[in-house]
């Protein structure tokens, strides 16, 4: 980020005055850098962001679709869903700061929740003079996690900008992220399955048992892992047509076991690739 862009960011801690437009309550217009990062760096919600300009024709076409999307998720949210924030960033005001790396407009991105709490540096601002505070802000800007967004948490939408495609995009990213977090929970010995939703606790316990009794003993055994994969895939194939509730529950556990096995294989592959380098 260039210096003039940063200085713009510092000044923008004051609320930017934006044109008065009609927006639904489900979509929030970003008015400051502070507001943008405060929302995007939450660990309890997803954040959908639309970057746009007033002169972009595609942005004008997208505007009512995006508002409808925000309203749709506000209506269908239930207590077990992780909330989704819907933001709009006007890149005519935030071009030097929030929009510097964008290839064009409009751009839509979904930011996944943080997996760990945000740890901020502790500074004694009250003991500093004005120019010292300003200089300290400049020095810490690039390293302050409050004003950073981990790119691994950002998924960019690529597709037709209609309600169905955008809704499918959100559901797919959220479903995959939920599964990844669930798998990480199972591998984390310090975490208890009681932390999960009640509906997921039995599945979590089955996953931890499988990891402890089977996968932990196969770690590093490529042939053993491949044999176990074939066994699980055969079970799914043999019972895939059985619609009974009991078999469905067993298949759910087997598919989880397959996901855990894939996670182990990916880890081994990453380790192998790193060793080759």
Swiss-Prot record:
Keyword Signal tagged: yes
Annotated PROSITE patterns: ER_TARGET, THIOREDOXIN_2
UniProtKB keywords: Disulfide bond, Endoplasmic reticulum, Isomerase, Redox-active center, Signal
Record-level GO BP terms: protein folding
Signal peptide: 1-22
InterPro entries: PDI, Thioredoxin-like_sf, Thioredoxin_domain
Main location (coarse class): endoplasmic reticulum
EC number: 5.3.4.1
Effect listed in the UniProt record for changing residue 59 to S: Loss of function
Disulfide cysteine pairs (residue numbers): 56-59
Intervals of motif Prevents secretion from ER: 274-277
Effect on the protein upon substituting residue 56 to S: Loss of function
GO molecular function annotations of the record: protein disulfide isomerase activity; protein-disulfide reductase activity
Pfam family name, one: Thioredoxin
Annotated catalysed reactions: Catalyzes the rearrangement of -S-S- bonds in proteins
Family: Belongs to the protein disulfide isomerase family.
Stated name of the protein: Protein disulfide isomerase MPD2
Organism whose genome encodes this protein: Saccharomyces cerevisiae (strain ATCC 204508 / S288c) (Baker's yeast)
Gene name tied to this protein: MPD2
